[in-house]
Design a protein with these regions (language model features):
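Short beta-strand segments enriched in small/hydrophobic residues
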Residues: 14-19, 53-69, 169, 177-184
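Alpha-helical recognition/docking segments in bacterial nutrient-uptake
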Residues: 56-168, 172, 231-232
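Residues at secondary-structure transition points
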Residues: 1, 22, 26, 30, ...
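ATP/adenylate-binding site constellation spanning eukaryotic-like Ser/Thr protein kinases
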Residues: 14, 32, 58, 77, ...
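A general structural signal for well-ordered alpha-helical segments in protein cores
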Residues: 3, 14, 32, 46, ...
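Bacterial carbohydrate/catabolite-sensing allosteric modules
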Residues: 41, 82-87, 111, 135-142, ...
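Short gly/ser/thr-rich secondary-structure transition/capping motifs
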Residues: 41-47, 101, 121-123, 252
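N-terminal helix-turn-helix DNA-binding module of bacterial transcription factors
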Residues: 1-59, 342
Length: 342
């Protein structure tokens, strides 16, 4: 069964059948229904990939992301899929593990697969990797603040504002010495934003705050082992802030095993809030980063570019999403209500 046979059985032209599949709004309802009835009767499905090769579009986009197992990553994926699905596109997922070579190999593969566009999350590549050896001639959006990746469509979360709100809260509780436990596979973006937010909060509060930075695997096990090392060295900080919720959960377990009380002996907070943060004891003060909205924003930027090829690809388009601080119990908050949102 092919499109010509469908046209013959429906008593219409091949062009009409093509319009039913591609631009149904341009076909009279009774004609459209007649064609669709024939396709249903014969279980006919258009070969979208072959059609894409003919028209120069495959209705497929690629999402290159360092990891897919975290709550944050899953929300980005969900946001991208929501927008892509509404557009009738499928999404190819490529897990790069934060490895430049893996990411580059995936990009080469996506070029041969002729995807219509690419979303890269926290890319570790530089602009020369695209224009010289790869020459990717397709719309690309970057999620993250990497200024060297060559993307002119960028979406990212305002980590400086997130750090400012968190540190401001910590300073009101009397904390002055803050340690950041960072993902050992990421660049220094969060650490830089954390330091900038800390300094701004200190200036506003007219007090001096100090930041020290540690690295660990972005997992519960990574947080657990990192805190064990701190205990063994006798370097338990006043406040420990983690880059993600999983590290914080691991630290909470390590503190309990080591008979260290949170928040009495050490305050604990994290970026990238998840549902787990509100149900553990003590509930963890965290910064909610709207990852699903971030994925949706990136996908919308990408599809705007795919659908409007008259846009100047060299004009920077930037979308910045704002955080929300969720004040709970792990930093010493004594407010009687369950949660405060700032």
């Amino acid at each position: 069964m092919n499109i010509r046979k469908i046209a013959e059985l429906a008593g219409v032209s091949v062009a009409t059948v093509s319009r039913v599949f591609n631009h149904p709004e341009r076909v009279l309802p009774e004609t459209r229904e007649r064609v669709l009835a024939v396709t249903r009767e014969h279980n006919f499905t258009p070969n979208w990939f072959a059609r894409g090769l003919t028209l120069g579009a495959t209705k497929t986009i690629a999402l290159l992301i360092p990891a897919i197992d975290s709550y944050f990553s899953q929300n980005i994926i969900s946001g991208v899929e929501t927008v892509a699905g509404n557009k009738g596109y499928v999404v190819l997922f490529c897990q790069t593990h934060g490895d430049q070579e893996v990411e580059f190999d995936f990009l080469k593969l996506m070029k041969t697969r002729k995807v219509d566009g690419i979303i890269q999350v926290q890319s570790q590549l530089s602009e020369t990797d695209f224009h010289e050896p790869l020459s990717l001639n397709m719309p690309r959006v970057h999620i993250g603040k990497n200024q060297d990746c060559g993307c002119h469509m960028v979406c990212y979360l305002d980590y400086e504002e997130a750090a400012f709100r968190l540190v401001k809260h910590l300073l009101t509780l009397g904390h002055r010495y803050i340690s950041l436990l960072y993902d050992d596979k990421r660049d220094g973006e969060l650490a830089d934003e954390m330091e900038s937010g800390l300094k701004r909060a200190g200036r506003e509060a007219q007090c001096e705050a100090h930041l020290s930075i540690f690295r660990a695997e972005d997992s519960a096990q990574g947080g657990y082992r990192a805190f064990q090392r701190m205990v063994q060295k006798g370097t338990i900080p006043d406040v420990l802030v983690t880059a993600g919720d999983l590290q914080a959960i691991g630290i909470l377990k390590a503190a309990r095993d080591g008979h260290i009380s949170i928040p009495e002996d050490m305050a604990l907070a994290c970026f990238n809030d998840s549902p787990v943060c509100s149900v553990v004891s003590p509930a963890i003060t965290s910064v909610e980063m709207p990852a699903a909205k971030l994925g949706m924003a990136a996908a919308r930027l990408l599809f705007d570019s795919i659908e409007d090829d008259t846009r100047d690809p060299d004009i920077l388009q930037e979308m910045i999403l704002q955080p929300k601080l969720k004040i709970r119990e792990s930093c010493g908050n004594k407010t009687g209500i369950f949660e405060l949102f700032v």
